[in-house]
């Protein structure tokens, strides 16, 4: 497990229901439950800032999963973060027509076009092949 924090504009609480720690998730626009109850969205900006301050100057990955190309609520501040952090990398998984990487961070970015579920399965298969405990034959090859 790596330290992480998740920003999302989804309001369905699926991340929490999938086992992610609610303290590490910020549904920026609130949840449907909050909306139905007339509550304001939680503001975890201070939590995000505290998390990011611990990694200033260190290796940092911003992983974007399926954020529409026009959604600037999350994309813009994270892209600016990557631009200003020397050891940050921006990785985006999205449908080809939704991929957007500005020129300022193009050299620090990876775009993976396609269906997110398929891409994640493919990455998992590749990672399993690189696992140090994978079975090897008598020549030491996997």
Question: Locations of the language-model features?
Answer:
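Conserved catalytic alpha/beta core of Sir2/sirtuin-type deacylases, generalized to analogous enzyme cores
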Residues: 1-142
